[in-house]
Structure formats: structure tokens, C-alpha cells
């Protein structure tokens, strides 16, 4: 047989025209071809390979002969050869390689065969061969006419190839062609279970996403695969457009519920921002311990569910959701870390380390501006610790070292020190409510609001204390009480509080500042809820204001209130944008841009970012035309109405890029590059906004490249760029105690020792860096960076939008707006409890989180870990896992408050 085979070998090239489309090379002619061919083959093919090749060729020949009785054994043998070739992952299996030139001939043979079993059998073999030919989806074509035997028998590579062709074919068929889609669906129903069983869950998901049939996943998933599938689906969410992203989340949520993983399902319902679903998941869970864990998660996210009183352990659940214990748990952590000792601003400034010939930057005369800075620093550093050395002992002495509005902020800082401690805190603030100074009184009102931030209390002390002052004759009193209510009820969407506040906007006595703060407070309370009353009242206020009033710098808070009301709501803002069309420029584009970016906050929406970049690059033509006009006139205009500059909305667009991209790593990286360009080549309005955008994209995450950029621009020629850069450094490092940043800020303090405004910013940044002595964070993302807290984003935006006009707002009289940051303050700790909610110290490994999406097996989720005993602090990008098998966590993400259960199999 071998002889015969060898004689026939030269015949092979004559079939090449048929196989040519598959990519065989052109051959030289006649005799040289035979000689060259023989030589090459001698070198290339080992004896075994040669035998295999000849055998395969003979089988193909047989199929071409007239004797049909030989077909079946020949096909059987071909199939055996193809299957038994153990494939190395890097090269094409030998039988497929040798059969490739005969592909065309096999197709001809197939066409000429009589219908029946053999013909279908041949189709199977051609389908497998088609993998090696880059052609017209023939792998799929022949599969569909083949014998329909099990996919698995042909191996993984074949299944993967087929899946790709199914997806392409599906997209070319219209919805109308349902009949043609049927056989494809049948194939998909074979492919998906195969992938699930062979560690290729992500390929199954990809296929179903391509053909938009994600719901089919649920029935094929088993206990072992669901976690991986859901992880893959949720990590795809950032990369698919509306409405597919919510379809993926809902699919993953369905899978979690199928396996009774309630905490994970709840997390996805919060991502979807679907409150009915949240309530449904919470109430359908019958395990009280898991319900308590979910209550902790809701409390952290700032969501409160009104439970019916007959729910088991109603009081406990309500208390957990209300964050009543937040303060005592936080103080327990502080005691554990031994950081209860109150700090004074000088401990933070470390003026003794400055080698200054004229004494340190802090040793100049007591100026009101520096005392104000110290009030903020003192508040930030001792936030939530309940004691300090300036205010809690004998506060009056310190308060009177401040002037006017400074007193307001100084008094309010007491609220920050007593943060979350509703019962103990209000009694300490109470005495200042009787002060003869309106500013101190107003500050004390704001402090009452701050103390209640993020904590619910059924007695509603904040509402009771502050409601009388909302329409007070003095606008100063209004400011403190309204902003206080905004912070105390942020995210609650409480109708009673809103009905109290909304009339203030239209009140004739309200200054523009009060109207602005009211819009802000209402936006914070109704954050992300699309509340109709808030929308209509703010829109009405904007319509009623004259053009000059809208040029007031505080007018920017009106559209911000609108934006916060629609935070993350996407297309729901079309009507508002249409309503704003009647407002005159430049306020219109400012308001439009601001509402638009809020609606897509954290969505990672690429198209929106592109629109914003267009806005950023708009200004150049108009600038050149303006330059011919009288420059002096332009200067006067700048002085009078800086915020009404035509480019004001560009600053918002820059912030918007950060706001949209911050939810997702790749988008954030791309935004960083863009900001680099804007800083170098942008207009002044743009450059002032870039540091703020950098702060937003990296809150409480002191990345060196961002710090270096900010450090460079903290010496910028444009003072507003340098103010914003310095403050941004504080936000980027907030609550981290980052030593490198602290050193940078000390150098800046020396550099700006003679410039009170810059020094004020440096002090603020120093206070933020040591926020809560390094135990708090301002980052709006939690639960492994999956969930964005809308209340936190509202707080950050309030501050950053105000910084767009830093000179008139923050360095002017409205520095109290910095307390917006309170809404974003959260302890960055991990505390473990047993089922009775008693603290339970266990050892945990804390390390850098590793992305394990789509990896096979059970890869490690953290790297470079250290083992600690809870309670512990978690830095940005760190993840914790239990280091003992004695307990099992009720939720897979160890962050915040976690309940542990005894592992029933531990003693075995």
C-alpha cells in the first residue's frame, strides 16, 4: 500500500486549484516540482507523518471511487484519525494539516454523494476541516447539514470556532428571519452547556451576549460556575451600551437569586438603582443573619427601607440600616488602633520641620484667615472622634478668633468632630444655638445637620432643630439651617423636608446665595430620584431670575441642584435640557452641560465623554475674534463677572469627563491623558478645572503620577490653577496620611508662606490628607469599587463645582460649602461580627486586589498580603480575605461591617 501511496503522491498538486482559495501556495512546474517536493518532504516529514499522510490521501481517494460500500469505513477512519490526534495548543493537528489540500475535493465528493447517513457523516468531517480554511463560514454550514452528533467529540477548539461563526451568522440575519435562527439556537443550546462544563464560562457568556440571549444562561449554570459567570457579566457591564448593561446585571442578579446568594443580588440591585427590587430581595430572604448583613450594606450605601413592623428582628434591622452604631463601631476601631488622642493643627502642619529663617509658616501673627484654616484642619483631622483641643473644651475662646463667616465655619466644624454621634453630639452643640452672634448660631445649626449626616434617627432631631430657621429674617441663619438639612437628609428623598425647603428658593427675601444653597440642599436630599417638585421649583427659579442675577456666581448651584436630582439617570433629562433652552447664554450652556454630566455620572459612557471633549475644544475660534476687540473692555468684564465668562461651561465639561469616567479603570486612564493635554494647551477656564477633575478621578487614591502633575501646577502662574491644584492634592490623598504628600505640602507651605490664599489651600489640603487621622475616605465607590454612593458623589460635586470659582466662593465668604465633603466621608475599615453582632476579632489577609475575571480554576484574588486581626483599615485598591477556615463570611466582599458564621465543617 505504501508503494502505491508513494506513486500517487505526485498527483496531489493537480488537486490544488480546488484548494487554492484556502491559501495553498503556487507550485513550480513539472519535474523540478517533483524533485524539490521530494527533497522537502524527505527533510520535513518523519516516517510516521509520511505514513499518516499517505493513509489520509488514500482515504480521500476511496471516497472518490464508485464503490459506495467503501465510504462508511473510509469516513469512520478519517474521523478516528482527526479525533485521535492529540493537539498541541500551538499548532494545527497533523491530520487536519495533511487533509487541507483535499478540502475542495472533499466538498465535491460531498456534493456528488447520495443523500443519507454517509452524506451527513461527510458533512461532519468537512465541518471540522473548515476550521483550517479561512472561508465563508463553512464550518457552520456543514455542521448544520451534518449528522448532529455530539459537539464535545470534536474538541474544544472546534466548539470555539463554531461559536464564533454562529455569532456572525446571527448578526447577519434579521429579526424577521426567525426560521433561519432556529437551527442556530439549537446549536447554541449545545455549545453553552459544553463551555460551562469545560471551564470556559466566559466564552458561553460572550456567545449569548453576541446573540442577545443572555437569559438562557440561568438554566445551564451550576453551583460551581455561578460565581465566575456573574463576575464576568458584571465586569462586562462597563463596556456595553444602554440597555444591554442593565440586561446583563439583571441576568446576573437572577442567577444569584437562583442560588440564594442574597447579598450579591442586593449589590446588583443597588447598581441598577432599582429600589423596588432592593426591597423585594431584602424581604424575600428568610435568614435573619443574612438580612442583617444586607442591612449593613444598605446603611453603607445610604439606602433606608421602610420595613413593616412584623418583620422578625425589626428593631435590629432598622437600627443597622440607620447607621446608629456607626459612631460607636468607629470609635472601637480608633481605640484598637490607639489613635484616640485629639490632635491640634500644629501636629499636622509640623512647622518645626520647616527650616525657615524667619520662623515657620505657622508662626506669623494670628490672622483670621489662618485661624479659619485651622478650624477646618481641626475638624477634618478629628472628624468623628468626638473630642479635640480647640472646640470641645472651651469653644468660645476659639470661635472669637474668627471673623464673621469664619465664625460660621468654625462653629460648624464642631459638627464634624462629633460626626455620626447624634445623641451625644447635639447636646454639645446646643449651647451655641443661644449665642448672640448670628454667624455662630448659623454655624451651630449647620453643625447639627452635619452630625446627622448619614445617620437616621426616628426622632428626626435635625428637622426639629433646623426647620424654624429656614425662613429666618437673617439670610445668614437661613444658610446654616438649609445646608444643614441638606447634609442631614442627603439621599433620603424625604417629602416633609423638601416641602419645607422648596418655598425658600422663590422667597423674596432670599439672596442669590440662599436660593443657590437651597437648590443644592434639595438636590442632595433628592439625589438620583428625579423628584418632580424639586425639578419644577428649581427650573421655575432659574426662569424667574434676571440675566444679571444669573451672572451671580451663586447661580451655578441652581443647575447643580437639578443635576444632583437626576444623578445617574441617563436619558431622563431630555425634558429638562429642552426647558433650559429659553435661558440666555452663557448660563444656558453652563446649566445644560452640568445637568448632562450629572445624569451620566459614573457610567463610563464613551459617547458622552466625546461630546464633552468637543465642548472643551470649542473656544479657540471665538477667542481669536475677540482679541481684536478692546482688550481693556475684556479685562473689566473679567473683573466684574468672572463666572459669566463664555467658557464657564467648559470647566464643567472637564469635571464631567472625570465624573463619567471615574467608574471604570480604562476610561479613567484615558481621561488622565486627556487632562494632560488640556493642562498644557487649554484655555484658562479649562486649566482651572483640570486639577479638580484629577481630584475627582482619584479621590483618596494618592497615585504618584497624579500627585506629581498636581504638584507641578501648584506653582502655576495663574493663581486659580495653583489654588485648585493644592486643594486637589488634599482630595487625592484624603484620609491616607500619605507621607510623600505630607512632605510635598510642607514644602508648599514654606513656598507660599507669604501668600495667605495659597497658604489657606495648603492648610486645607494638609487637613484632608490626615482626614480622621487617616481612617476615613472620601471615595464614593465601595464594595470592591462596584457601587457608587450617590450621596458621596453629590457631596464631592458640591465642593468641586464651587471650586470652579474658587476666588469668590471658597476664598470669599462661602467656605462653609466645604462641609459638603461630610456627605462623602466614610470609615475605610473592616469590622467583623458574630451572628449576635458582637465584635469578633479574626485574622484576615489584606493585600492588593487582583483582577481574576475570566480566569480558569480558583486563582488568588489578592497579592502581597499581610495578615492582621480585625478591625483593620483597607486602603484604596486593597482587598481582604479571611485567613482562617473556622468562620465563613455571609458576604463575599469583606469591607465595612461583615457578619461571620461558624464553619460547620471546621472540626471535621
From Swiss-Prot:
Compositional bias ranges of the Basic and acidic residues kind: 24-52, 623-643
PC repeat ranges, renumbered to this chain: 409-442, 443-479, 480-514, 517-551, 560-589, 692-723, 742-757
Modified residues (N-acetylmethionine): 1
Post-translational modification Phosphoserine, affected residues: 16, 29, 147, 361, 363
GO biological process: proteasome-mediated ubiquitin-dependent protein catabolic process; regulation of protein catabolic process
Any one annotated GO CC term: secretory granule lumen
Modified residues (N6-acetyllysine): 551
Region: Required for interaction with UBLCP1, residue numbers: 708-903
Any one Gene Ontology molecular-function term assigned to this protein's record: enzyme regulator activity
DNA damage in keyword set: no
Regions of compositional bias (Low complexity) in chain numbering: 10-21
Residue numbers of Phosphothreonine PTMs: 24
Chain segments carrying region Disordered: 1-52, 623-645
Tissue distribution: Found in skeletal muscle, liver, heart, brain, kidney, pancreas, lung and placenta.
Annotated positions of the Phosphotyrosine modification: 194
Alphabetical UniProt keywords: Acetylation, Phosphoprotein, Proteasome, Repeat
Subunit comment: Component of the 19S proteasome regulatory particle complex. The 26S proteasome consists of a 20S core particle (CP) and two 19S regulatory subunits (RP). The regulatory particle is made of a lid composed of 9 subunits, a base containing 6 ATPases and few additional components including PSMD2. Interacts with RPGRIP1L. Interacts with CRY1 in a KDM8-dependent manner.
Function: Component of the 26S proteasome, a multiprotein complex involved in the ATP-dependent degradation of ubiquitinated proteins. This complex plays a key role in the maintenance of protein homeostasis by removing misfolded or damaged proteins, which could impair cellular functions, and by removing proteins whose functions are no longer required. Therefore, the proteasome participates in numerous cellular processes, including cell cycle progression, apoptosis, or DNA damage repair. Binds to the intracellular domain of tumor necrosis factor type 1 receptor. The binding domain of TRAP1 and TRAP2 resides outside the death domain of TNFR1.
Family per similarity comment: Belongs to the proteasome subunit S2 family.
Stated name of the protein: 26S proteasome non-ATPase regulatory subunit 2
Organism: Homo sapiens
